[in-house]
Structures are given as C-alpha cells and as structure tokens.
C-alpha cells in the first residue's frame, strides 16, 4: 500500500536564536522521524508530529533541508504567522506529486494534511511542549554551521507586521486580479463568431494556470530563500547528509514554507482567487439553463428552444469550465516543472533581500494607496461629462469593481483561514464564500435587470458589487486545486455540492425574476 509522508517531514531547524532552544532540538530530528515512520499508512503518529509539538507552519520557519549537495542553513524567514494560516486556500498539496514520474510514489491528500493540522492544534491546547532533547548535539551542529559560514542573519517579523504585509498584498493583488479578469473577459467575448459565448471561461482557465504554476514552483521561493549561501569549500563534506534527505518530504516542507510568506499568499489567494470567479461561472450555468446566455452582452433575442436543449447547454457550460480549469491547473504545474532548470541556470528566483526589506514595506503604501485611488476615481471618474452623464462608463466597467474587490478578497481569506480546517474532507470556508458570493451576485443581477428600476449610478454600483465583491469573494482556482487534492469520493461530493448548491441559489434568486417579469435592459452597460 502506498504511504503518504507527513507534510512536516523534511524540516530540520528552529526559529529561536539560541542553538539550545527547544524548537531547534526538536526540529533537527524530523527527517530521521520520517525514515522511522515511513512504513505507516499516512505517515503520521503521536510521536511524529504531536509528540514533537511542532506545527507545519512553525517548522517551515526553521531550517529547510535541500535535496542537493549543499547543506541547508538556518532560515531567517521568521514571519510570525497565526496557526490558522495552515488552512489557507494555498494548499500544502502540490498538483503534481510525482514530477519525476517514478514508478512508485507516495501520494498525500488534502484530508490528511488538514487532519494533521487540526489534531496538532487540539493537542497544543491539552498539553505543553515536551522538554528539549540532546542540547549538546544541537549546540555542536549550530557551532559547526556557524564556522562553515552558512548561518544566516535572522530578522524577526512580528505577527502584527506579518498580518499587515499579508493584508496589503491581498488588497494589491485583488485589484490586479480584478483588472485582469475584466480585461480578459472584454478581449475574449467582444469579437464576432466566438466559439465560446460565456465570458467566465477564459479568466477561470488563466487563473488556474497561474495557480498551478505557483503551487508547483520551487524556484521563485526557493527552499533556501532568505538564506546566506554556504561556503563552497564545505560542499563535499555535506554530500552524505544531503543523500539522506527525502525529496518528497523536502517538497512538502517547501509547500508549507511558501504559505508563511506574505507575497506568496498575496499571489495565490489574492491574485488567482480574484482572477477567477465561481459566482460568474454559476451565473453562466443558469443563463444557459434559462436560454439567456446567447443574448448576454448582445442585443439579439434568444431563439426559443425546448427544455432538453437547455439541459444540454447547462451540461456544456459546467463540463467545459471544470475541465478547462482543471487542465489549466495541471498545465501551470507542468510549466513550473519544465522551466525549473531555466530558473536555476539564470538565477531567476525572487531576491529575498528585495522582498523582505523593500517590497514588504512598499506594498503597504501600494496596497492601501491603490485602493484609495480606486475610490477617488469612482468619485471623480476620468470620463465625466457634465452635459452627458449617461456616457460615463468607467465606474460601471472598472472603478466600482476595484472599490469592492479587496472587501471580497479579505472576506474569503479570513473565511478560509477559520473554516477550512473544520472538515478536512470538505473545505467549508471555500464552500461558504462561494455560496455567499453566488447569492449576492444573483441579487445584484436581479436589481440591475428589473425593468424601470433605478438610475445609472445605482446600476454602476450594483455592477461593481457583482464584478468586484462577488468576483473576489468566490474563486475557481482554489476550488479546482481542492478537487485535485481531495480523495476521489470526497472530491465528487464537494464538487457536486458546490455546483448544485450554487445553481439552486441562482434558480431561486434569478429565476424568480426571469420567469415572472423577465430580465430588463441594463442601463449602465453599453
């Protein structure tokens, strides 16, 4: 039977500054624990994780073993992240768990990872950390690394600063993701004779490609990211130790490491989650069911058809979107594997000094400053015409969406952090925000399509809520990554509940207007 290594395997370091600190003493033996527990069914035991008192995110801030000929140094990635970050949308499960195509591999699932995280948190509430072990050996290792010139300077980042950086990245990348989604929709749905007539498909595909690349990539945020380069004279002495490192465990360690970096959280949760939109996907399913999809974005009236054709249209939108999104996720992961050598050869990884000392501080101004700029552009739009207010399009097309986008992204971020770990086999946080965003989009759509109701400004605000808040509150990139990481039965249950629940909400919300008064013309969209 294939066994799955724990996501804590491969960590061999600590966060404390002292070589004799408890964290350093416990973390240095985790790789040996992996070899001892390798034959277990899920690679997890009381002595393997909870016995050491270590959390995957806490370990990721320690020393990271490199599957190469050079020794790992003490990583200075001392972001003080909350334990809830273990349940973020950015999963610990890589889309491609066997990149080398080995004949026998050990697979892990999302249920196992989140069960371990949940059990750790419960264990920490019941008992304190165990006493340190082998302090003499830990001190010797620390001194040997110090003499070898591989101990990096540590820079402690407080929890308040870490959360501030994370929120700022989320705000900034939610704005970029919203602009990318709206721009790609305009590019792919405006030309004649388009083979795909529903606008949500291409942003969802493109966002999943980026998500797959970020999840699989190990070069942008390298395993030794933020560490000083070791002394090359000591490389030969470290060959034997490097051979003992399990590449699968090291890969899982790197996945957990990335989730502690605010920039990575901003890219995966902020940009990819805002680039894709689950609520727009469900809206297009309902429009296909109600025979309004062909007329969406055009003045041509739909041709009447029977219910059987509407059911076929519903299946077409559903299957096409899910298939392309999953394909995009794996295509992005394959792209990351393919260009890994190129990144290594030309040293194209993100420089740690620039990110930690400059970009982390600059993003606070950029994030909140750009959000404020979107508010000001909504108050004074660039295309304002005093004599012809009906020609103002910027607010309905983009600026109001940018105002509401960070609110949806931050809501999704905290919902996933607090809810995703409650049911390991069913990501509750992602499900809740997808259902909530779908319902809100349905209400905004109804209010915008009620005949003879409201004016241009009210229409623009509702359009901004639909494109900005609902578009960033719901996500397809995270959803398909969870489908790929869950066990087969749980994936079908979770996927079916998400699509079925979202469509049921749209039938109730949008159907109540569609099958009574009918959809009217939108006043603020040309």
UniProtKB/Swiss-Prot annotation:
InterPro entries: FluC. The chain crosses the membrane at residues 160-180, 195-215, 261-281, 311-331, 362-382, 399-419, 425-445, 453-473, 493-513. Residues 1-73, 90-149, 223-242 are annotated as: Disordered. Residues 181-194, 282-310, 383-398, 446-452, 514-526 are extracellular. Keywords: Cell membrane, Membrane, Transmembrane, Transmembrane helix. This is Fluoride export protein 1. Belongs to the fluoride channel Fluc/FEX (TC 1.A.43) family. The lineage of its organism: Eukaryota, Fungi, Dikarya, Ascomycota, Pezizomycotina. GO terms for biological process: fluoride transmembrane transport. Fluoride channel required for the rapid expulsion of cytoplasmic fluoride. GO terms for molecular function: fluoride transmembrane transporter activity. GO terms for cellular component: plasma membrane. The keyword Transmembrane helix applies. Residues 1-159, 216-260, 332-361, 420-424, 474-492 are cytoplasmic. Pfam families: CRCB (PF02537). It catalyses: fluoride(in) = fluoride(out). It is a multi-pass membrane protein. It is found in: Cell membrane. Residues 21-36, 103-123 have a biased composition (Basic and acidic residues). It comes from the Eukaryota. Disruption phenotype: Highly sensible to fluoride. Growth is inhibited at a 200-fold lower fluoride concentration than in the wild-type.
């Amino acid at each position: 039977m294939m066994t799955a290594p724990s996501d804590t395997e491969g960590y061999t370091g600590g966060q404390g500054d002292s070589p004799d600190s408890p964290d350093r003493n416990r973390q240095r033996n985790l790789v040996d624990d992996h070899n001892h527990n390798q034959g277990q069914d899920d690679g997890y035991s009381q002595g393997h994780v909870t016995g050491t008192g270590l959390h995957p995110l806490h370990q990721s801030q320690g020393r990271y073993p490199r599957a190469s000929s050079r020794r790992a140094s003490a990583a200075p990635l001392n972001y003080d992240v909350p334990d809830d970050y273990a349940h973020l949308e950015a999963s610990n499960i890589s889309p491609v768990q066997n990149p080398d195509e080995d004949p026998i591999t050990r697979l892990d699932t999302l249920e196992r990872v989140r069960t371990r995280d949940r059990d750790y948190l419960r264990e920490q509430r019941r008992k304190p950390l165990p006493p340190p072990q082998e302090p003499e050996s830990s001190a010797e290792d620390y001194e040997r690394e110090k003499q070898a010139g591989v101990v990096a300077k540590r820079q402690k980042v407080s929890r308040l600063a870490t959360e501030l950086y994370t929120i700022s990245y989320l705000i900034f990348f939610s704005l970029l993701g919203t602009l990318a989604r709206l721009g790609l929709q305009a590019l792919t749905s405006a030309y004649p004779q388009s083979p795909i007539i529903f606008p949500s498909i291409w942003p969802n595909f493109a966002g999943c490609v980026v998500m797959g690349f970020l999840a699989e990539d190990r070069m942008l945020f390298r395993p030794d990211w933020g560490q000083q380069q070791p002394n090359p004279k000591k490389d030969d002495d470290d060959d034997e130790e490097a051979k003992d490192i399990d590449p699968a465990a090291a890969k899982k360690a790197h996945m957990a490491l990335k989730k502690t970096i605010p920039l990575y959280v901003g890219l995966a949760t902020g940009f990819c989650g805002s680039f894709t939109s689950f609520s727009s996907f469900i809206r297009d399913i309902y429009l296909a069911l109600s025979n309004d999809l062909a007329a969406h974005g055009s003045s041509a009236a739909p041709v009447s058809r029977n219910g059987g054709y509407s059911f076929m249209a519903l299946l077409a939108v559903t299957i096409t979107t899910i298939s392309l999104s999953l394909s995009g996720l794996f295509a992005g992961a394959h792209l990351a594997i393919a260009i890994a050598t190129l990144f290594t050869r030309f040293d194209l990884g993100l420089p740690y000094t620039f990110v930690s000392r400059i970009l982390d501080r600059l993003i606070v101004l950029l994030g909140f400053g750009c959000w404020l700029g979107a508010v000001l552009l909504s108050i004074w739009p660039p295309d304002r015409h005093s004599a012809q207010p009906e020609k103002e399009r910027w607010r309905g097309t983009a600026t109001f969406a940018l105002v509401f986008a960070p609110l949806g992204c931050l809501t999704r971020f905290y919902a996933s952090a607090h809810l995703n770990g409650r049911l390991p086999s069913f990501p509750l946080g992602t499900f809740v925000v997808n259902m909530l965003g779908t319902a809100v989009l349905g209400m905004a759509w109804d209010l915008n399509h009620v005949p003879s109701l409201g004016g241009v400004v009210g229409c623009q605000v509702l359009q901004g809520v639909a494109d900005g808040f609902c578009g960033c509150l719901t996500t397809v990139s995270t959803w398909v990554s969870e489908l790929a990481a869950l066990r087969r039965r749980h994936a079908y249950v979770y996927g079916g509940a998400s699509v079925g629940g979202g469509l049921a909400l749209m039938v109730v919300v949008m159907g109540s207007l569609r099958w009574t008064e009918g959809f009217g013309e939108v006043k603020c969209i040309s």
